[in-house]
């Protein structure tokens, strides 16, 4: 019977050893699974954080772009309004006493550009004034001319227009940054 007890005891010891190994192996598997799960969770968390940061950057960029577009639109509208006001004031200049001197300068500048002039064209409202200022050339009406003069070269095929509005148009590019800055203040 001692042999039975000895075999039983050895079998019980073997069972305990196998159980202990199984527990150790199960704990290792469990620890490894936890480690992989934690790594996967951390990886997903980093990915989500990266995506969140990218979404924030995109949202900020979109907002900045929208703000810039709104500012540009406001600036363009403001510039257009400024030029409308200036053009209105330029049209009013023709009714001021100083316009005689202004028209005389515009005529002189245009005639310098075309020394062989045939005629001077002005707005019908400026015809009498232009005839006082120009005595050596024909002075004709041209309703298309506003606030200035057109000097026609001999033969009538070419000419030069020198108007206040034309000068404003030529300076528009130079004035735009200054006007924008003033509107922004």
UniProtKB/Swiss-Prot annotation:
Q: Give the GO terms filed under biological process for this record.
A: proton motive force-driven plasma membrane ATP synthesis
- Which controlled-vocabulary keywords does the entry list? ATP synthesis, Hydrogen ion transport, Ion transport, Transport
Q: Does the keyword Ligase apply?
A: no
Instruction: Give GO cellular component annotations, separated by semicolons.
Output: proton-transporting two-sector ATPase complex, catalytic domain
Disulphide bridges, residue numbers: none
**From which domain of life does this come?**
Bacteria
Describe the task this protein carries out.
Produces ATP from ADP in the presence of a proton gradient across the membrane.
Q: Which family does it belong to?
A: Belongs to the V-ATPase E subunit family.
Identify this protein by name. V-type ATP synthase subunit E
Organism whose genome encodes this protein:
Deinococcus geothermalis (strain DSM 11300 / CIP 105573 / AG-3a)
Q: What is the lineage of its organism?
A: Bacteria, Thermotogati, Deinococcota, Deinococci, Deinococcales
């Amino acid at each position: 019977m001692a042999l039975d007890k000895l075999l039983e005891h050895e079998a019980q010891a073997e069972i305990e050893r196998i159980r202990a190994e199984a527990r150790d192996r199960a704990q290792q598997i469990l620890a490894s699974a936890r480690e992989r799960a934690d790594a996967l969770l951390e990886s997903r968390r980093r990915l989500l954080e990266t995506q969140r940061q990218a979404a924030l950057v995109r949202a900020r960029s979109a907002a900045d772009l929208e703000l810039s577009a709104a500012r540009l639109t406001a600036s363009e509208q403001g510039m257009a309004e400024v030029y409308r006001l200036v053009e209105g004031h330029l049209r009013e200049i023709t009714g001021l006493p100083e316009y005689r001197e202004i028209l005389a300068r515009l005529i002189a500048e245009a005639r310098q550009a075309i020394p062989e002039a045939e005629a001077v064209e002005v707005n019908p409202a400026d015809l009498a004034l232009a005839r006082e200022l120009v005595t050596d050339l024909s002075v004709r009406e041209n309703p298309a001319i506003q606030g200035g003069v057109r000097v026609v070269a001999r033969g009538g095929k070419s000419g030069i227009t020198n108007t206040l509005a034309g000068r404003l148009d030529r300076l528009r590019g130079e004035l735009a940054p200054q006007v924008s800055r003033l509107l922004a203040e």
